[in-house]
């Protein structure tokens, strides 16, 4: 049937900030949905709190709300916009849960809003563990033996009482009075949420105890309606069982967990299915997990298509997945169904399904070229699959054709355990990865080895790895333990075990990885041994065969004690180069006009390898992306790359994107003119450029927008004679090189904190003695503040040098100095020295984003950090415009920024970080590239500064580039205030201290917008998941130098009814200054103490600042308790002041919602 005409406007709910389990893939799906529905003529209303997304660009939707994604806030948007329909399937678990809450609150009914894409009943049936189990039983599909722990009975009673009150209100009032009365009733219901949750948890815990006797141990615990396995896990003993149950019940919005029999070691598969109103169902892609059951699919290495199923097994699974969609009632759109198969007897069970587009949907879309989100959006408004064209084949096939692929795709997740000292790297059913890489090859081996080097963790392939505890004598058991424990390094452990003599059968017994995959890895390991023994082949045929197995030049070089350049030269001499094939959805059955490509060294049975690159004769620019997401380098850089592609297209260049991240908008087939899905290594990029230079004109390469990843390639590209657009690699090096940068600052008469540089352990001690404590230390050339720390004393310095720095030593240096820790460190520091700075206490940190064309410059935004200097800028909340700085300071910041931009001959973007102490300005660092604040600034000032920067880099003047996008921004004309807040994954890493420092640990960000600073801050907190209390008790414990300053926020809270609780010294000070407060013990002073009060929910807000290292350690348990109880916790005075202002503003009146477009119009 054609599209629906009874719907005029559609509300799309985004996914909010990037968190573990919900990343860029929902910006990709949301962006596709916005474009697809807007081109059909619908009015699009979008809500998303994440400013770093493409979907929140003001030209993508008609009304773009950068507001917190909570049911209460979205209800206000619905009341204001009155959409006809709501599409909740594009924003992950956040959107689904919000839509269901809106339905339960009666908002959808009140405003006559229809849920499209997935009905509420279908979402409930898929996400509610009990309903799903019953549905599977009904259609004859097996599920794991399981029992539920929930509080359904008492919840139903509460809900009935609430519904009865709603009916009374409806009978009593009408019109505006009815709306007010219903809002009041809902507010009262929300205020009782904490008390109800406690009752439900107690009831469900009792049920869990009964379930344990039936299901037994080990048991898999899966909370309902959660994201990425949040709160779940595998329990091997009773203590673990009740810990995970409590965590899972707390994480589940419905206070329900499923307790399943153990299926550890079974094989895991996924099916991506699309269905339309006419019951046409197609399988987009089958996905197989290399890791057996027990590891969350988001943390598993996966391949597409599934490689170890027989055709019969595949057909059974295919039919089963379609039956699941029909029974659950997913009428339109994409869904993901997960299966497990017992390899011992072939028993197949259904694990779960997602009735929405998901992380796997994004992977399947990129793996096949089939745009699941775009098609799902069109199906939601009435189209059927046969009415839609397949874009990839240029309409030669309809969307109802099942994709067929003639290559293998491998996805490997990327982790960040090094950012969370004390966290366990063991993988379970709760997702922990922060990003992923995807690689494509004609064979599994080629695809796998490309993915390994695409991870950007320093691997060149199956690099050697040390087996833990192997030196303790029991070699066989140490190896079995290493390969039997799921960790990020498990696959390399498997290869190492084979090098040490274990057979495929022995490795399979320990790891439960399918023997077929192990045979492929064994083949690579045996080939490596032959290369070590005989060297590289000197003929084209045999060298091409090695490359076809996925070996990188760097890996071949390390196996033969050569340089990668030597291998590249041998390849060039023998004319061994990759060819480029197209992703066409149809295994080359139809010609594809879409330039979506991957490289392969395939060796055909006859003839020469054929390239499908079809290079154009246009003027072209290559944009290098950021690779897999990681902490410190995420969606913000992908946003910049996308904007560069859009801007270059506007300027009539052919935009060519190179990236390997399947989650992102940059790897969508229609973001750029040509897309190469390839690892971002010098070898892979230079091969692409070799092909692209064969026709047309290569204007240059952009390395400035993808974070540290492309910057690392700048020297190799320059050495190869490739033109680099924008700021020169030498200027980038000047800003990174401490000695050269210091000379530049002296020349410009600009300040920086007293500092030093150390090329050895001994020199580090001397520099620290010269500077004095406290000081900041960091390795050179890092992004996200990796291994950056504030050192308070000699003991801290010793721990840093002997514990932290060794973790940075690469494997090749460790191998060179196996038993010499100091030798390893000094070798590392010889190339990458340690940088020391005096730590500026009590300083205000400022971020400045600037554009420059080499001569003229313009400051786009000056952001004042709410956290003091010393906390990584990526983890700090900040405001734009500045909140407390004087106009004179702002003018001086602009002058110094302009001086730096001109001196560095910046072409494009530059970010400068300043610290202001006692009115004096210090430069902390300069980054002559795009920074992670670019999207936030662009959304605040209303100018697409990344697009402007790309035009400047292509050769336009600052003036002309701005004119192309509506002229220069006018900061003084902006009455609104934006606050950015960071979002952290601490709940995923039990035992990790939540105290912030100079090493970045946030995964995402949100933005609060308002005309009032306090309300903008409140929105940012709410968007980040921090529920600011309107009443209750504030706990205060601050260091002596903060006592005077804490009086303001505490008095403000006391004046609006808050009780105050404080530790000894702080409580005496507050009482002496007229603030009534109650004394409570510190943790070290005996019980009952502050942690008990937090856990007993007697405290609702925490202000806690510490100075010495021991005080930081003492307060760790308080920080952990506040995290587990989801309490707002502020560790700086600026944060406490802002929180008090925000709470007072919320108490005075409710939040108002406005679209971004209104802010710009005003």
UniProtKB/Swiss-Prot annotation:
Family matches, as PANTHER family: CARBAMOYL-PHOSPHATE SYNTHASE [AMMONIA], MITOCHONDRIAL (PTHR11405:SF53), CARBAMOYLTRANSFERASE FAMILY MEMBER (PTHR11405)
Which InterPro entries does UniProt cross-reference here?
ATP-grasp, CarbamoylP_synth_lsu, CarbamoylP_synth_lsu_oligo, CarbamoylP_synth_lsu_oligo_sf, CbamoylP_synth_lsu-like_ATP-bd, CbamoylP_synth_lsu_CPSase_dom, MGS-like_dom, MGS-like_dom_sf
Q: How does the record describe its quaternary structure? A: Composed of two chains; the small (or glutamine) chain promotes the hydrolysis of glutamine to ammonia, which is used by the large (or ammonia) chain to synthesize carbamoyl phosphate. Tetramer of heterodimers (alpha,beta)4.
Q: How is the cofactor bound?
A: Binds 4 Mg(2+) or Mn(2+) ions per subunit.
Q: Where does Mg(2+) 4 bind?
A: 925, 927
* Chain sites annotated for binding Mg(2+) 3: 913, 925
Q: Which gene specifies this protein's sequence?
A: carB
What is the protein's known function?
Large subunit of the glutamine-dependent carbamoyl phosphate synthetase (CPSase). CPSase catalyzes the formation of carbamoyl phosphate from the ammonia moiety of glutamine, carbonate, and phosphate donated by ATP, constituting the first step of 2 biosynthetic pathways, one leading to arginine and/or urea and the other to pyrimidine nucleotides.
**Carbamoyl phosphate synthetic domain: annotated span:** 614-1025
| Binding annotation for Mg(2+) 2 | 352, 354
> Which amino acids does the record list as binding ATP 2?
778, 838, 840, 845, 870-873, 913, 925
* Binding-site list for ATP 1: 129, 222, 228-229, 261, 263, 268, 294-296, 338, 352
Which cofactor(s) are needed, names only?
Mg(2+); Mn(2+)
This protein's GO cellular component annotations are: cytoplasm
What is the source species? Brucella suis biovar 1 (strain 1330)
Keyword Nuclease on entry: no
Q: What is this protein called?
A: Carbamoyl phosphate synthase large chain
């Amino acid at each position: 049937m054609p599209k629906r005409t009874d719907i005029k406007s559609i509300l799309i709910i985004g996914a909010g900030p990037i968190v573990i389990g919900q990343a860029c893939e929902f910006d990709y799906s949301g962006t596709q949905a916005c474009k697809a529905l807007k081109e059909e003529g619908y009015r699009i209303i979008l809500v998303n709190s994440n400013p770093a997304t493409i979907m929140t660009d003001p030209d993508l939707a008609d009304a773009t709300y950068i507001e917190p994604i909570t049911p209460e806030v979205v209800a206000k948007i619905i009341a204001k916009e009155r959409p006809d329909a709501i599409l909740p399937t594009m924003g992950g678990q956040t959107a689904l849960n919000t839509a269901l809450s809106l339905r339960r609150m009666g908002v959808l009914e009140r405003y006559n809003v229809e849920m499209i894409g997935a009905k509420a009943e279908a979402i409930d049936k898929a996400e509610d563990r009990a309903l799903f189990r019953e549905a599977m039983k009904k259609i004859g599909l097996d599920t794991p033996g399981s029992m539920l722990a929930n509080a359904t009975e008492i919840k139903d009673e509460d809900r009935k009482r609430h519904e009865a009150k709603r009916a009374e209100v409806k009978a009593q009032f009408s019109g505006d009075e009815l709306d007010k009365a219903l809002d009041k009733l809902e507010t009262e219901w929300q205020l009782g949420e904490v008390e109800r949750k406690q009752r439900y948890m107690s009831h469900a815990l009792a049920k869990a105890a009964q379930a344990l006797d039936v299901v037994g141990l080990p048991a898999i615990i899966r909370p309902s309606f959660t994201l990425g396995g949040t709160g779940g896990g595998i329990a091997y003993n009773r203590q673990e069982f009740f810990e995970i149950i409590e965590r899972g019940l707390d994480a589940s919005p419905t206070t329900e967990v499923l307790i399943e029999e153990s299926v550890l070691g079974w094989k895991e598969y996924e099916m991506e299915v699309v269905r339309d109103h006419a019951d046409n169902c197609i399988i987009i892609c089958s996905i197989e997990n290399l890791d057996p059951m027990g590891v969350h699919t988001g943390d598993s290495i996966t391949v597409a298509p599934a490689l170890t199923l027989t055709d019969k097994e595949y057909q059974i699974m295919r039919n089963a997945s379609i039956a699941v969609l029909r029974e659950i009632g997913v009428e339109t759109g994409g869904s993901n169904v997960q299966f497990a198969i017992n390899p011992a007897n072939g028993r197949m069970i259904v694990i779960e399904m997602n009735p929405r587009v998901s992380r796997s949907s994004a992977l399947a879309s990129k793996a096949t070229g089939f745009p699941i989100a775009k098609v799902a959006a069109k199906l939601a408004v009435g189209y059927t699959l046969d009415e839609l064209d397949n874009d990839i084949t240029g309409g030669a096939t309809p969307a109802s054709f099942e994709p067929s692929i003639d290559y293998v795709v491998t996805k490997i997740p990327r982790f960040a355990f090094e950012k969370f000292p004390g966290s366990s790297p063991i993988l379970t059913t709760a997702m922990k990865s922060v990003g992923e890489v995807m690689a494509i090859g004609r064979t599994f081996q080629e695809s796998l080895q490309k993915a390994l080097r695409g991870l950007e963790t320093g691997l060149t392939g199956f690099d050697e790895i040390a087996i833990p505890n192997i030196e303790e004598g029991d070699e066989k058991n140490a190896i079995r333990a290493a390969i039997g424990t799921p960790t990020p390094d498990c696959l390399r452990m498997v290869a190492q075990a084979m090098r040490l003599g274990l057979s495929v059968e022995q490795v399979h017994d320990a790891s439960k990885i399918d023997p077929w995959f192990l045979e492929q890895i064994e083949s690579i390991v045996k080939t490596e041994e032959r290369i070590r023994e005989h060297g590289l082949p000197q003929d084209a045929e045999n060298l091409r065969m090695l490359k076809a197995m996925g070996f990188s030049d760097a890996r071949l070089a390390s196996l033969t004690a050569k340089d990668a350049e030597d291998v590249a030269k041998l390849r060039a001499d023998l004319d061994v180069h990759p060819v480029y094939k197209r992703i066409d959805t149809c295994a080359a059955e139809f010609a594809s006009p879409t330039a979506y490509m991957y490289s392969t060294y395939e060796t055909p049975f006859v003839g020469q390898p054929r390239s499908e690159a079809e290079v154009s004769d246009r003027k072209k620019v290559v944009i290098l992306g950021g690779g897999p997401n990681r902490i410190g380098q995420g969606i913000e850089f992908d946003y910049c790359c996308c904007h560069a592609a859009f801007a270059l297209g506007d300027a009539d260049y052919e935009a060519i994107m190179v990236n390997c991240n399947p989650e992102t908008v940059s790897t969508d087939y229609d973001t750029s003119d040509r897309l190469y899905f390839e690892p971002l290594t010098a070898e892979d990029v230079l091969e692409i450029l070799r092909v692209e230079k064969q026709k047309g004109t290569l204007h240059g390469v952009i390395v400035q927008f993808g974070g540290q990843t492309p910057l690392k390639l700048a020297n190799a590209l320059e050495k190869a004679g490739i033109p680099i657009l924008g700021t020169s690699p030498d200027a980038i090096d000047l800003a990174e090189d401490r000695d050269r940068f210091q000379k530049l600052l002296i020349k410009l008469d600009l300040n920086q904190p007293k500092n030093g540089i150390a090329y050895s352990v001994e020199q580090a001690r001397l520099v620290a003695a010269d500077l004095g404590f406290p000081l900041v230390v960091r390795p050179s050339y890092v992004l996200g503040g990796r291994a950056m720390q504030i050192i308070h004393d000699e003991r801290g310095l010793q721990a840093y040098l002997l514990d932290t720095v060794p973790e940075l030593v690469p494997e090749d240096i460790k191998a060179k100095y196996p038993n010499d820790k100091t030798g390893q460190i000094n070798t590392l520091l010889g190339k990458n020295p340690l940088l020391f700075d005096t730590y500026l206490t009590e300083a205000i940190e400022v971020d400045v984003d600037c554009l420059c064309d080499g001569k003229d410059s313009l400051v786009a935004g000056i952001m004042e950090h709410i956290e003091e200097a010393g906390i990584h800028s990526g983890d700090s909340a900040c405001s734009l415009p500045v909140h407390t700085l004087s106009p004179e300071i702002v003018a001086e910041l602009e002058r110094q920024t302009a001086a730096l931009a001109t001196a560095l001959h910046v072409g494009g973007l530059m970010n400068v970080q300043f610290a202001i102490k006692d009115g004096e300005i210090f430069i902390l660092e300069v980054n002559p590239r795009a920074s992670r604040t670019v999207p936030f600034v662009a959304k605040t000032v209303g100018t697409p500064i990344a697009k402007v920067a790309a035009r400047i880099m292509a050769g336009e003047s600052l003036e002309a580039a701005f004119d192309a996008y509506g002229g220069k921004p006018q900061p003084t004309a902006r009455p609104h205030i934006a606050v950015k807040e960071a979002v952290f994954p601490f709940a995923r890493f039990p035992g990790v201290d939540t105290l912030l420092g100079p090493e970045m640990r946030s995964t995402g960000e949100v933005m609060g917008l308002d005309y009032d600073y306090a309300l903008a801050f409140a929105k940012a907190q709410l968007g980040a998941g921090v529920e600011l209390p309107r009443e209750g008790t504030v706990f205060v414990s601050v260091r002596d130098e903060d006592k005077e300053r804490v009086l303001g926020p505490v008095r403000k809270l006391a004046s609006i009814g808050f009780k105050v609780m404080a530790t000894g010294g702080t409580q005496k000070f507050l009482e002496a200054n007229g603030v009534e407060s109650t004394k409570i013990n510190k943790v070290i002073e005996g019980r009952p103490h502050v942690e008990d009060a937090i856990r007993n929910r007697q405290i609702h807000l925490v202000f806690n600042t510490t100075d010495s290292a021991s005080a930081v350690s003492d307060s760790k348990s308080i920080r952990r308790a506040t995290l587990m109880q989801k309490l707002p916790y502020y560790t700086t005075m600026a944060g406490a002041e802002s929180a008090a202002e925000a709470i007072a503003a919320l108490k005075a009146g409710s939040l108002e919602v406005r679209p971004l477009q209104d802010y710009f119009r005003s």
